[in-house]
Amino acid sequence: MEGEDGLGSPSLYRFTAEHADLLAAKGCIWDEGYRDTREQPVISLGFKGITFLELRAHGARADLHSKWGAIVPNPAWRLVQALATITSPKGVITIDGFSSHLAPISAEDAEVLKTIELDEAGLKREFRISGWVRSMKGPALVKEHIFGPTCTICGIQTGHTDAGAKTVLPSTAMARLDFRLVPDLTHEIVVNLLREHLDRRGFKDIEIVELGNAPLAKSSAKSIVARAVIESAHEVYGISPLVYPMDPASGPVGAVCGVSAPPTPVASFGISYAGSNPHGPDENIRVDDFLQSIKFIGRIIYQLGAAITETNSVKTAELKLERAAVQSRS
């Protein structure tokens, strides 16, 4: 059990970096997943990375009466103006040079994307929203959801935010942002590009404070662990699972699966459902999903054993053929 996920898992990263030799494996099973609005189990073969940071603007030594607003700089406005340069009104990230660091989608991933269909109407009902960003739909929506980088304002804090009126000119303003990272985009690239982007626009005074990060994890649907999990889902749930090449969420998966060479393949699933509301005040799971997941795990263990036995048998047969060929030549 690792309890620092929300903090960026700093202790886990230190441990895995020091003990990479202990983590080499044929596959990794991760515990992130759910059943969607149509009750299809969702299996992910990786996770986006993440960069979490703060932008801070500073003004007077302390909050002032707002009568000074005509002549004293307001850090809240300063921060808002800086934030407005980071994305377009349509939600496209506009940081200089950002798009040039996004890897093209591989042929294998493009084929997997074709099999995914989001329950757009059901999700909109669940979230109580009227539409998606940039009015996307269909394959474009799926592609953006899984392979699109993000820049999310997670919170803004400045001035007087309690109930009632108070005429305040804030002394500080802070925004917390997270960036979800896709292939070829790293924490270091994002921080450096953001710093340069703000500096070019006259925002050298905006402070960037790095709070945490995690690299992405990415593997193939052809791996032994992926095949075992997908086949087991068919058998246990009686329905074809949705297979995501990469989960839109993030976590310390890269710290575990990315430290060995080659990286360890990962397949992830979970016991939540569309209404679980992870990280919300009413986060929950259903008892039936919990019980069915026990059967799912049992079937995966069986499938992994069968797959590895088959692989070893093939290797043994190939070795016998090689030896026979050598003997015949001699």
What are the residue ranges of the model-derived segments?
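Alpha-helix capping and helix-loop boundary segments enriched in small/acidic/polar residues
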Residues: G3-L7, V42-I43, A70-I71, S220, ...
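Acidic/histidine-rich catalytic neighborhood of metal-dependent amide-processing enzymes
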Residues: M1-G46, T309, R323
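Short coil/turn connectors at secondary-structure junctions
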Residues: L22-K26, G49-F52, P262-P265
